[in-house]
Amino acid sequence: MDKTKIHKMWIADQGDGTYTNPILYTDYSDPDAIRVGEDYFMIASSFCNTPAVPLLHSKDLVNWKVINYIMDKLPFEYYDKPVHGCGTWAPAIRFHEGTYYVFIPMPDEGIMMCKTTDPWGKWSEPAYVRKVVGWIDPCPFWDEDGKAYMVTAFARSRIGFKSMLYMSPIEPDCSGVLDDGQFIYDGHATQPTIEGPKLYKRNGYYYIFAPAGGVKPGWQTVLRSKNIYGPWEEKIVLHQGNSPVNGPHQGAWVDTPDGQDWFLHFQDVGNAGRIVHLQPMHWENDWPVIGVNAVDGCGEPVLRYKKPEVGAAYPIDTPEDSDFFEGDRLGLQWQWNAKYKKEWYDLKDGQLLLHAQAADPKTQLCDISNLLLQKWPAPEFSVTTCLHLEQMKDGDVAGLVSLGGCYTALAVQKIHGKMSLQQRTGNWTKDDEVRTGLGEWNSDVIYIQMKVEKETYRTFYVGTTEENLQPVGQMVEATPGRWVGVKDGLFAINEQGMEGGLVAADYFVYQEL
């Protein structure tokens, strides 16, 4: 693979002082962000994938890099296997008296907290703020008098109701709640499915920024009150309007050192997941106005706009995607399909070594733990890998997988000393995986490429060299997973219930079509 042909996949910074939305065409769902000095930090939900809760950094709100994860592994054995749609939901990040705090809801376990004084370094092990089922989307807040609070929403799938917000007084060090708290807002009548609350204070008002109306079609609501327990005035401040951006909501109000205001939020585009946008924001009569073309204080998203004024120009950059496995650690673009184990892989001499893990042959590929995955980086692309197969053992299956609701994989299987090609397709909601043989494979090296067109159509190509790739198998349409977009990656398993061999990958490279 010629590295000079590798380019960044999605560039929002136009190089002329403007940016285009989305700023990240990648599934960083449920974003929250803060500014500390001249640095911006953003986090996102990651459900059952590990490491969990990605942490991104930027100097200008447009160019972002993943710098860390808040949790290395999920703290419950339940997540040793994939539990689609469970795990870490919408988190919140805050900075208080020299410490960074991240609140993480796990709807089946409770509200967890991790903290650090160095966001690039190690975060504390997760600790309970409250052990409770069905509470989601927590956000901490410290008032001027030193008292601390946590606002939360509710998951109807776990607790039987939604569209309500709740306020709990908490210990200032976030080690627990002080009392049972109380309901503070009922959105059933005017703000259905209100959730994802973020709590701020400005000019004597408490503000709750919260999405409502549902993930795909919803809008951004803001509540305000002079009392942290309400009653609350309400206003819709951002909606789709005449823009092509559906459901512009759930995110973070941030400012620049010179006082500009901005709003980060997601847009659910289906197969690519919930991608990230940046909107200008200003204040009128102590209400935020987000976006442009505001009518009665409700704006709509921008597609192109002047970059934030942060006092300096910073290089154009994007999160990592392609990987040549040249370091001694996995790139931060990678996550596993469940709680990972170090023995699943090695990095050596510029290769990723995947050790085939024992797997029940009846288990669907989407439910295999040791799938090494990363998010889609653009709406259309090809992804290519080169795998060395000479150390495979009988029963081993290895290849390139594209996950999602409907998933597909192109793999090499070794049985009785002979290798053959196989395509696997299925749906995570059904037990109906189809395994289609595609003929013998007589080389110890395989190049596998998958093309994704129109954010939907996935087609595989294989060859013994990068130059002789030929189409193989069936095109499989992508569908999103449970609250997540499609992820692509590599895997190696052994379906004879034994310790398998290994497969060596030279690279995993994304390119524009």
Give the role of each language-model region:
Residues 1-513:
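Carbohydrate-active catalytic/glycan-binding domains of CAZyme proteins
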